[in-house]
């Protein structure tokens, strides 16, 4: 049986680290005027994927 192909969109969005997978926070690209400074500040940076989603991310990225 051939190797499973990776989902190219998933490989662009998720990065494997020693502690799990990190990803960019959503809701930060546009329509930012109605969001409070506190909300925008908390959405900054990268977050780790929840443990319940790790198996599906591994399948999509073929890690």
Curated annotation (Swiss-Prot):
A biological process from GO: translation
Cited InterPro entries: Ribosomal_bL35, Ribosomal_bL35-like, Ribosomal_bL35_CS, Ribosomal_bL35_sf
Pfam families: Ribosomal_L35p
One term of GO molecular function: structural constituent of ribosome
Transmembrane intervals: none
SUPFAM superfamilies, A to Z: L35p-like
Gene3D superfamilies: 4.10.410.60
Renumbered residue ranges of the record's region Disordered: 1-22
Origin: domain of life: Bacteria
Family affiliation: Belongs to the bacterial ribosomal protein bL35 family.
Name of the featured protein: Large ribosomal subunit protein bL35
Source organism of this protein record: Marinobacter nauticus (strain ATCC 700491 / DSM 11845 / VT8) (Marinobacter aquaeolei)
Gene name per UniProt: rpmI
């Amino acid at each position: 049986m051939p190797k499973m192909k990776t989902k190219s969109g998933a490989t662009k969005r998720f990065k494997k680290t020693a502690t799990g997978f990190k990803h960019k926070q959503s809701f930060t690209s546009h329509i930012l005027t109605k969001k409070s400074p506190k909300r925008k500040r908390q959405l900054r940076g990268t977050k780790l994927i929840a443990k319940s989603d790790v198996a599906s991310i591994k399948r999509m990225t073929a890690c």
